[in-house]
């Protein structure tokens, strides 16, 4: 009886909550309910932390050089496209970089932003291949809690962003992230091409700097909300989530920077058997 009552309450809560969702995204893939993505992400976590390493335990690492080169440069091109779409749907065509609320209209620009937000959300599922490649190549030391957490929480939280607030100032971090990914995945693609291309990777330290700048800009941009009394952004809870996420990763990268470049400890080699060792965010 108690379980039945709890179930009924949960269903009523979900129905009351979901009625405020943006109807424009109802027919997009994975957007009808959070359940499909939760299942996918649950299977991902199970595979990369348990099943995958067990299956690979007595097997030789897969040689995935061509697949990784193709994958990384595909992400570069996809990120260029998404960055351009973010610019054309708001960030370069009218957004003020301050209190930009969500446009829920059916205007071409608003619908373009909706589509771009969904593309960014979907790209996070493609990027799960980062970890799967680690597992298949038996690079289990790179499958850290931070890595898996990042790749799991990003698509899961972005489902709610697309479902309720596809646009406005809450998308700045996505716009910035697509630009950063163009540089990052270019680096990973060159890494995957082998030792012959190591001479082109002298800018590894600047890659970490770029990621730090990304988190600083995201934190500053979202932090403006505390100083704008008349900002009527529709879902401020998303801004708190974004700011918390930005602050967490800013601190983590500052720690990495201090340990690697300031304290004087040696960095992991840029290449190990032709493959990169680097943070991916």
Curated annotation (Swiss-Prot):
Side of membrane Cytoplasmic, spans: 49-72, 137-142, 195-206, 258-281
A Pfam family of this chain: ELO
Main location group: endoplasmic reticulum
Kinase recorded as keyword: no
Transmembrane segments annotated in the record for this chain: 28-48, 73-93, 116-136, 143-162, 172-194, 207-227, 237-257
UniProt binding sites for 3-oxoeicosanoyl-CoA: 124, 137, 139, 142, 147, 187, 204, 208, 211, 266
InterPro entries the UniProt entry points to: ELO_CS (IPR030457), ELO_fam (IPR002076), ELOVL7 (IPR033670)
Keyword terms, alphabetized: Acetylation, Disulfide bond, Endoplasmic reticulum, Fatty acid biosynthesis, Fatty acid metabolism, Lipid biosynthesis, Lipid metabolism, Membrane, Transferase, Transmembrane, Transmembrane helix
Record pathway: Lipid metabolism; fatty acid biosynthesis
Keyword field contains Oxidoreductase: no
PROSITE patterns: ELO
GO terms for cellular component: endoplasmic reticulum; endoplasmic reticulum membrane
EC number: 2.3.1.199
Motif, HxxHH motif: chain positions: 147-151
Top-rank EC class of the record's enzyme: transferase
Domain of life: Eukaryota
Compartments (UniProt record): Endoplasmic reticulum membrane
Residue window of motif Di-lysine motif: 277-281
Membrane topology label: Multi-pass membrane protein
Reactions performed catalytically: a very-long-chain acyl-CoA + malonyl-CoA + H(+) = a very-long-chain 3-oxoacyl-CoA + CO2 + CoA; eicosanoyl-CoA + malonyl-CoA + H(+) = 3-oxodocosanoyl-CoA + CO2 + CoA; (5Z,8Z,11Z,14Z)-eicosatetraenoyl-CoA + malonyl-CoA + H(+) = (7Z,10Z,13Z,16Z)-3-oxodocosatetraenoyl-CoA + CO2 + CoA; (6Z,9Z,12Z)-octadecatrienoyl-CoA + malonyl-CoA + H(+) = (8Z,11Z,14Z)-3-oxoeicosatrienoyl-CoA + CO2 + CoA
S-S bonds: 99-231
GO MF assignments: fatty acid elongase activity
Notes concerning its domains: The C-terminal di-lysine motif may confer endoplasmic reticulum localization.
The family this protein is said to belong to: Belongs to the ELO family. ELOVL7 subfamily.
Protein name: Very long chain fatty acid elongase 7
Name of the coding gene: Elovl7
């Amino acid at each position: 009886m108690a379980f039945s009552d709890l179930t009924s309450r949960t269903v009523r809560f979900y129905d009351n909550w979901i009625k405020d969702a943006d109807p424009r995204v109802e027919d997009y893939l994975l957007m009808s309910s959070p359940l499909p993505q939760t299942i996918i992400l649950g299977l991902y976590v199970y595979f990369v932390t348990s099943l995958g390493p067990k299956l690979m335990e007595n097997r030789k690492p897969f040689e995935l050089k061509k697949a990784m080169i193709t994958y990384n440069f595909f992400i570069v091109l996809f990120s260029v496209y998404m960055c351009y779409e973010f610019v054309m749907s708001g960030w370069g065509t009218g957004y003020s970089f301050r209190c930009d609320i969500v446009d829920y209209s059916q205007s071409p620009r608003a619908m373009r932003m909706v589509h771009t937000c969904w593309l960014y959300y979907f790209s996070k599922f493609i990027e799960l291949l980062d970890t799967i490649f680690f597992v298949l190549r038996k690079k289990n030391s790179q499958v850290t809690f931070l890595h898996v957490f990042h790749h799991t929480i990003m698509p899961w939280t972005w489902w709610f962003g697309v479902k309720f607030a596809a646009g406005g100032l809450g998308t700045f971090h996505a716009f910035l992230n697509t630009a950063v990914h163009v540089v990052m995945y270019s680096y990973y693609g060159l890494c995957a091409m082998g030792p012959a291309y190591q001479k082109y990777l002298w800018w590894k330290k600047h890659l970490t700097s770029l990621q730090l700048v990304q988190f600083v800009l995201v934190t500053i941009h979202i932090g403006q909300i505390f100083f704008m009394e008349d900002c009527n952004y529709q879902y401020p809870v998303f801004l708190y989530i974004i700011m918390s996420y930005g602050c967490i990763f800013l601190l983590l990268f500052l720690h990495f920077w201090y340990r690697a470049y300031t304290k004087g400890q040696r960095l992991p080699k840029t290449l190990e058997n032709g493959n990169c060792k680097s943070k991916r965010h």
